[in-house]
């Protein structure tokens, strides 16, 4: 099943290039604040699944071209992200430590945006702002101290995720938490849609140039161990997002670009890149030159 959030917080089931509105059956109020409708659906999915399937069969079909797709989980309890979790990316960044010893960091939930939004680049002279192609794990069941052997019991589904990053030496959380710096979408593919989570292929293009391509088989810390590590410190809740890390090929974005990310058996989304309103930021006052390691 592919579950989308659209048109101001409504819930839909995607079948092919059509969407079926199941908001009423899901028990979601699109006007609710905070916007936790999808979190409620995820938490109650076992009870709701049959009714959602039936509603999708009877609900009028809307063309995906005629709706505004939004980030699937607008108000997660947290966004967990793993740094340098692919060896080729660690090499290009000259990183001496990897996700297996660094653990995770957090991104601000306010950095989320969806497939119908634009990535807004702050105007920071002397800095590059890079794309990072990733997969989002969507947690479906609360848990703490989850053993790797049981980790997939807690995975609700998967989505495409872009981790937009200002290059520099400042605190990673701030460099990755500007508004629109975490596009997620275009929907959630439930776990049963993924034949082999150990070999999920993803790729990214900027304009027509393919810049990144990898599989989860190349991860340093695999998906079960990501969940084990994260839950050793923090309780995981339905709707929490875990970003799996980026492979090699990161590079700069500029206003006017388009970024396309595709994850097999999940989906594909394309976002435009624009310049955000200029605001002085003293933290990024010094230039930083990004140098890719050579081999």
Regions found by a protein language model. Give the residues of each.
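Active-site glycine-rich loop that binds ribose-phosphate moieties when present
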Residues: 104, 112-125, 138-146
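Residue-level recognition of short, solvent-exposed, well-ordered loop/turn junctions
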Residues: 74, 81, 114, 130, ...
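N-terminal accessory regions of nucleic-acid-interacting proteins
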Residues: 144-158
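N-terminal non-catalytic cap/leader segment that marks the start of a structured domain
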Residues: 1-98, 195, 280-295
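Structural signature of FAD isoalloxazine-binding scaffolds in flavoprotein oxidoreductases
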Residues: 97-115, 131, 260-265
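Catalytic-pocket segment enriched in acidic/His residues
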Residues: 7, 46-53, 60-62, 67-68, ...
């Amino acid at each position: 099943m592919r579950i989308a959030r659209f048109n101001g917080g409504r819930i839909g089931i995607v079948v092919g290039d059509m969407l079926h509105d199941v908001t009423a059956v899901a028990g979601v109020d699109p006007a609710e604040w905070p916007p936790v409708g999808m979190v409620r659906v995820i938490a109650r999915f076992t009870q709701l699944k049959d009714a959602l399937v039936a509603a999708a069969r009877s609900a009028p079909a809307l063309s995906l071209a005629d709706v505004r797709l939004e980030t699937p989980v607008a108000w997660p309890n947290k966004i967990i992200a793993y740094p340098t979790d692919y060896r080729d990316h660690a090499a290009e960044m000259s990183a001496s430590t990897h996700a297996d010893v660094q653990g995770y960091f957090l991104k601000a939930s306010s950095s989320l945006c969806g497939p119908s939004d634009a990535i807004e680049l702050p105007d920071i002279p002397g800095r590059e702002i890079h794309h990072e192609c990733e997969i989002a794990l969507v947690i479906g069941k609360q848990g703490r101290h989850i053993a790797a052997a049981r980790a997939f019991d807690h995975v609700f589904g998967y989505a495409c995720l872009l981790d937009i990053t200002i290059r520099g030496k400042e605190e990673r959380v701030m460099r990755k938490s500007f508004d629109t710096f975490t596009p997620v979408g275009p929907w959630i593919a439930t776990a049963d849609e993924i034949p082999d989570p150990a070999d999920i292929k993803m790729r990214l293009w900027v304009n027509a140039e393919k810049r990144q391509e990898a599989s989860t088989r190349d991860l340093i810390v695999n998906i079960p161990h990501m969940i084990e590590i994260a839950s050793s410190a923090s309780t995981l809740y339905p709707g929490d997002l875990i970003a799996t890390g980026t492979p090699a090929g990161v590079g700069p974005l500029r206003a006017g670009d388009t970024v396309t990310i595709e994850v097999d058996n999940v989906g594909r989304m394309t976002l435009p890149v624009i310049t955000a309103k200029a605001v002085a930021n003293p933290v990024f006052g010094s230039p930083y030159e990004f140098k890719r390691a050579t081999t």
